[in-house]
Regions:
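N-terminal targeting/tethering segments
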Residues: 2-109
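Extracytoplasmic segments of membrane-associated envelope/inner-membrane machinery
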Residues: 100-111, 116, 120-129
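Short, low-structural-confidence N-terminal segments
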Residues: 1-43, 149-202
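Hydrophobic transmembrane alpha-helix bundles
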Residues: 71-82, 107-117, 170-188, 200-201
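Acidic/polar surface patches and capping/hinge elements
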Residues: 108, 125, 129-160
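Alpha-helical structural motif
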Residues: 15, 93, 120, 143-147
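Secretory-pathway extracellular proteins and peptide precursors enriched for disulfide-bonded cysteines
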Residues: 54, 92, 142-144, 187-198
């Protein structure tokens, strides 16, 4: 791992400084929301880095499948996920879609990328469903299976490496989780770090 890198995703380097900037953006935007945002100082970089990596995986999935989306499609994707988030925010203890996004590590500056992520997923689902929207549970199940495989293959091809400072990638959820702490743990005290999703399942 290169010095100053938070993660290496394929040929793309996510620098620690760019991650620090997004974490700062998250903290600034979260201030007015007070106790709604429960991410700890340790969790914030992992939550932000999770999404930066997910965006890169989706970019690779799109490239693998000849998918490109327009700015208009990305804007539609953002509108769709904002609408979904607004309707589910209160159930999850948030006052708005913005609060829900922040609570999951998505800064206001990352929203355009989130819209593209949604648009790319939608375009892939339509493509593998014969160019039409999903209208049945059977179609949904088939498309989901294809999507999960394509996402796994994209992630695997990127040979993702996360700096131990921030944790490791759990491939079962594409989430950056705490890495096993072998330095500061007293003898005989097990680390609470998760061991799921150590490698891609494809």
């Amino acid at each position: 791992m290169q010095a100053g890198s938070a993660a290496i995703v394929g040929s793309q380097r996510i620098t620690s400084s760019s991650l620090d900037q997004q974490v700062s953006n998250l903290q600034q935007a979260s201030k007015p929301l007070g106790s709604q945002i429960t991410l700890t100082a340790a969790e914030q970089p992992r939550a932000v880095l999770t999404w930066l990596i997910r965006f890169s995986i989706m970019d690779q999935l799109a490239a693998d499948n000849g998918i490109s989306v327009t700015q208009a499609q990305s804007q539609t994707g953002l509108s769709e996920i904002q609408s979904e988030a607004a309707s589910s925010a209160s159930q999850e203890g948030y006052s708005s879609a913005t609060a829900l996004f922040l609570g999951n590590g998505i800064t206001p500056q990352m929203l355009p990328a989130l819209g593209t992520w949604v648009a790319q997923e939608t375009a892939y689902q339509t493509k593998v469903n014969g160019g039409k929207q999903i209208t049945s549970q059977a179609e949904s199940n088939t498309v989901t299976a294809k999507y999960n495989k394509a996402e796994c293959q994209a992630a695997k091809s990127l040979n993702i490496s996360v700096s131990p400072q921030f944790g490791r990638l759990d491939y079962s959820t594409y989430t950056v989780v705490a890495a096993k702490n072998t330095l500061s743990q007293p003898a005989g005290v097990p680390s609470p770090a998760s061991t799921t999703g150590l490698t891609p399942a494809c």
